[in-house]
From Swiss-Prot:
Changing H329Y: In EHMTO; loss of methanethiol oxidation in patient cells. The keyword Cytoplasm applies. Widely expressed. Highly expressed in liver, lung, colon, prostate, kidney and pancreas. In brain, present both in neurons and glia (at protein level). Down-regulated in lung adenocarcinoma, colorectal carcinoma and ovarian cancer. Two-fold up-regulated in brain and blood from schizophrenia patients. It is an enzyme of class 1 (oxidoreductase). It holds the Pfam family SBP56. Induction: Down-regulated by androgen in prostate cancer cells. Interacts with USP33. GO terms for biological process: protein transport. It is linked to Extraoral halitosis due to methanethiol oxidase deficiency: An autosomal recessive malodor condition characterized by extraoral blood-borne halitosis resulting from the accumulation of sulfur-containing metabolites. In extraoral blood-borne halitosis, malodorant compounds are carried to the lungs, where they enter the breath. This is Methanethiol oxidase. The modification N-acetylalanine is found at A2. The gene is SELENBP1. Its EC number is 1.8.3.4. Its main location: nucleus.
Length: 472
C-alpha cells in the first residue's frame, strides 16, 4: 500500500501523502480472554470494514495464540513509513507484545492479509536474559530496520521503563535500546522525532501495582506516574525529566506527524488533562496543560469524584485535529489544534460510559452537562463500557472505537464488559467544520464470539495508520 513510485519502501513519503491512501477494507485487533472466566488464548481478529462487502462488520478470521493469559494489548509493524526510502523493506509482519506474559508474537499478515498466520514466538526468557525487561507495551518500527518495544517493568514486576530491540528481519532479541542501567523508573508509551534528536516516553505504574486492578491508595502513595522522559535519540539516554502538573498517569503520546514539528500532546488519564510538550529555543523541553476535563461529583461509584479518564489520543495526519476518549465519562472528543496552544472543542459524542441514565451512578454536580447521557444502543445492543481505543482512517473521515481498556480494570470498572464482551463502533467525522456522528449501521459485537465474550483492544490497518507510522 505504498505511494506509487519507482523505488519505494513501505508506507508513504509524507503524512499528507498518507491521507491520499486507499480506504481501509479490513482491520486487525487483538481480543483478550484474561480475567473473563473463559479459559482460551487471546487471538488476533480480522474484521471486514468495507461497506460494499457482504461480510461487512463481521469477524472474518481469528488467529489464536498458543498460550493462555498473555493479555495482548497493542501492536506495531516490522517496518513502516520510517523506512519509506528503502525498497528492500516490506510491511508484512504485525508485532504483538503481551502486557502480562511478556511474550512477543510476530504475525504474518503479508502472505494472506485476510487470514493472518503465526510467524514467530519470542519467549519471555529470551527477553529476560538479554534485556532484564518485562511487561511489554508499545511497538514501533525504526528507520534502522529494527523494532523497538517499551516495557513497564522488570522480571519481578517492579517499575522499569526500558526498550527491547528486535532485529526487523529475524526478530531475534538484540538487547536494550537504552544504555545499560539507563532505563526510566517507569514506562508505557513512546514517540520519536529524529530531526530534533529526541524521543519522549511516558509512564503508567509498576506492573505489581496495576496487574490486578486499581487501588486509589496507590495514587496517594505516589505509585502512579506523572512524568515525561526526554531522551537523546542518538545517545540513547535520558537528558530531561518533565514533571507534569495535573498530569497523573500520562499514557498515550503523539508528536505532530510533521517530522519538522517540535511539539506534541500526551493524554493524562487520571488527571484527565491533555498536556502539550514543546521544544524551547535553548533546546530543552517544556510542558503545559492545554485541556482539562473536569471531574464529576457522583454517588454510587468507587470515589466521590469521577475523572473522565483519558485513555487514548490521536492526531489526524494533517495535524489539524486531536481526538481523545474519556473512558469513564463515556464521551469521545474532537479538538481543532490549528493553534496547538489553544485547542478548540469542535465535536463531542457520548458512547456509553459510567454516568448513563438508569445506571448505578448518580451525578450530583457536573460542570459540563445539564443531565446524564442516555445509554448507547446500536443495532439493538446496549453498549457496555465506554469509548477507549480509537483509530482514524487515513483521510480523517472515520473513527473506529473499541470499549475495553485492560482486562483487570474492565473487570473492576465495567463488570458488564466481562459478561457481554466489548464492541467496535464507527463514527463519521466532519473534517470541514468539525463534528462527530455515530454510524448507526456499524457494530462488531465481540460478545458473540464462538468461545465466549471477548475484550477487543487496539486497531491496525494493513497499510499503516496515524498511530503506527512515524515520518523521519
Amino acid at each position: 500500500m505504498a505511494t506509487k513510485c519507482g523505488n519505494c519502501g513501505p508506507g508513504y513519503s509524507t503524512p499528507l501523502e498518507a491521507m491520499k491512501g486507499p480506504r481501509e477494507e479490513i482491520v486487525y485487533l487483538p481480543c483478550i480472554y484474561r480475567n473473563t472466566g473463559t479459559e482460551a488464548p487471546d487471538y488476533l481478529a480480522t474484521v471486514d470494514v468495507d461497506p460494499k462487502s457482504p461480510q461487512y462488520c463481521q469477524v472474518i478470521h481469528r488467529l489464536p495464540m498458543p498460550n493462555l493469559k498473555d493479555e495482548l494489548h497493542h501492536s506495531g509493524w516490522n517496518t513502516c513509513s520510517s523506512c519509506f526510502g528503502d525498497s528492500t523493506k516490506s510491511r508484512t509482519k504485525l508485532v504483538l507484545p503481551s502486557l502480562i506474559s511478556s511474550r512477543i508474537y510476530v504475525v504474518d499478515v503479508g502472505s494472506e492479509p485476510r487470514a493472518p498466520k503465526l510467524h514467530k514466538v519470542i519467549e519471555p526468557k529470551d527477553i529476560h536474559a538479554k534485556c532484564e525487561l518485562a511487561f511489554l507495551h508499545t511497538s514501533h518500527c525504526l528507520a534502522s530496520g529494527e523494532v523497538m518495544i517499551s516495557s513497564l517493568g522488570d522480571v519481578k514486576g517492579n517499575g522499569k521503563g526500558g526498550f527491547v530491540l528486535l532485529d526487523g528481519e529475524t526478530f531475534e532479541v538484540k538487547g536494550t535500546w537504552e544504555r545499560p542501567g539507563g532505563a526510566a523508573p517507569l514506562g508505557y508509551d513512546f514517540w520519536y522525532q529524529p530531526r530534533h534528536n529526541v524521543m519522549i516516553s511516558t509512564e503508567w505504574a509498576a506492573p505489581n501495582v496495576l496487574r490486578d486492578g486499581f487501588n486509589p491508595a496507590d495514587v496517594e502513595a505516589g505509585l502512579y506516574g506523572s512524568h515525561l522522559y526526554v531522551w537523546d535519540w542518538q545517545r540513547h539516554e535520558i537528558v530531561q525529566t518533565l514533571s507534569l502538573k495535573d498530569g497523573l498517569i500520562p499514557l498515550e503520546i503523539r508528536f505532530l506527524h510533521n517530522p519538522d514539528a517540535a511539539q506534541g500532546f500526551v493524554g493524562c488519564a487520571l488527571s484527565s488533562t491533555i498536556q502539550r510538550f514543546y521544544k524551547n529555543e535553548g533546546g530543552t523541553w517544556s510542558v503545559e496543560k492545554v485541556i482539562q476535563v473536569p471531574p464529576k461529583k457522583v454517588k454510587g461509584w468507587l470515589l466521590p469524584e469521577m475523572p473522565g479518564l483519558i485513555t487514548d489520543i490521536l492526531l489526524s495526519l494533517d495535524d489539524r485535529f486531536l481526538y481523545f476518549s474519556n473512558w469513564l465519562h463515556g464521551d469521545l472528543r474532537q479538538y481543532d489544534i490549528s493553534d496547538p496552544q489553544r485547542p478548540r472543542l469542535t465535536g463531542q459524542l457520548f458512547l456509553g460510559g459510567s454516568i448513563v441514565k438508569g445506571g448505578p451512578v448518580q451525578v450530583l454536580e457536573d460542570e459540563e452537562l445539564k443531565s446524564q447521557p442516555e445509554p448507547l444502543v446500536v443495532k439493538g445492543k446496549r453498549v457496555a463500557g465506554g469509548p477507549q481505543m480509537i483509530q482514524l482512517s487515513l483521510d480523517g473521515k472515520r473513527l473506529y472505537i473499541t470499549t475495553s481498556l485492560y482486562s483487570a480494570w474492565d473487570k473492576q470498572f465495567y463488570p458488564d464488559l466481562i459478561r457481554e464482551g466489548s464492541v467496535m463502533l464507527q463514527v463519521d467525522v466532519d473534517t470541514v467544520k468539525g463534528g462527530l456522528k455515530l454510524n448507526p449501521n456499524f457494530l462488531v459485537d465481540f460478545g458473540k464470539e464462538p468461545l465466549g465474550p471477548a475484550l477487543a483492544h487496539e486497531l491496525r490497518y494493513p497499510g499503516g495508520d496515524c498511530s503506527s507510522d512515524i515520518w523521519i
